Amino acid sequence: MFIKLDGTKLSQKLKEDLAKKVNNQKIKILIIISDPSEASRIYVRNKINYCDSLGIQTEVYDLSKIDDTNQFIVEMNQKISLSNPNGVLVQLPIKERLDTNKIIENIPIRLDVDAFLYHRFDQDQKEKVIPCVLNAVLELFKEYQLSFLDKKILLIGNGITSNQPIVNYLNEHQIKFDLITKENSQLLEEKTKVADLVISAVGKAKFLANYQFKRGVIFIDIGIDKYFDPEQSKYLICGDFDYDKLKEIASYGTPTPGGIGPLTIYSLVKNLINLSEIQKVNK
């Protein structure tokens, strides 16, 4: 029997704990935008709405007109000094002409809500501020009593905010896995047939629809895209997997939307609250 890994339902449950932690505290997040696309603005709006519902202050700073990396960093840091937030979110993607890694490396560690710089955190911050997608997956596994152990694990894609933190986690815990990227994509077809757990972060609509998976597979869909549905004459949100098709043979899986997405926003705000608490202790 297939069980839907319901990220929306779980995030609503976990949100109650966040509300208790906030408890009328003054907490503020600064969101910096580089990409002017509608998709980025939707992502930002969802995060703002979530923060608003908890009484967390948000400020958006639009740097989408800047095409020089050094100027971007200077203006970002000037705004951080003026705004005095508890956390900073640089919304990805960053425009291609800018150096994403250099910008991320210049986010103050004490304000890094996405945990991009997790490798530079001290031990206390590492325990309390976890990369958002990784935490989303761990929360789902905890709720549905799933595990990485004793499984053939297949990761597809390794973006900085998606599968890369999961790669790091599995390596730290000495858990074996296969990773498919552009460099070895010719292996994808044979790997999907034998994997017990597949986590995909490609971001192409139903990218895996025509691949074969084993019966009982667990699938986690981090990718998000849209496709045109001629029957409804409109675009619909979807992930890398064909959810309706795969759930016929899978044991567990995440829908898109409603799977990983809501839990990444929860994880972001959880990190923000924990950063605020760390800052109070270190004052």
Curated annotation (Swiss-Prot):
InterPro entries: Aminoacid_DH-like_N_sf, NAD(P)-bd_dom_sf, THF_DH/CycHdrlase, THF_DH/CycHdrlase_cat_dom, THF_DH/CycHdrlase_NAD-bd_dom. It holds the Pfam family THF_DHG_CYH. The keyword Oxidoreductase applies. Pathway: One-carbon metabolism; tetrahydrofolate interconversion. GO terms for cellular component: cytosol. It comes from the Bacteria. Keywords: Amino-acid biosynthesis, Histidine biosynthesis, Hydrolase, Methionine biosynthesis, Multifunctional enzyme, NADP, One-carbon metabolism, Oxidoreductase, Purine biosynthesis. It catalyses: (6R)-5,10-methylene-5,6,7,8-tetrahydrofolate + NADP(+) = (6R)-5,10-methenyltetrahydrofolate + NADPH; (6R)-5,10-methenyltetrahydrofolate + H2O = (6R)-10-formyltetrahydrofolate + H(+). Its EC number is 1.5.1.5, 3.5.4.9. One of its GO terms (biological process) is methionine biosynthetic process. One of its GO terms (molecular function) is methylenetetrahydrofolate dehydrogenase (NADP+) activity. Homodimer. HAMAP family: THF_DHG_CYH. This is Bifunctional protein FolD.
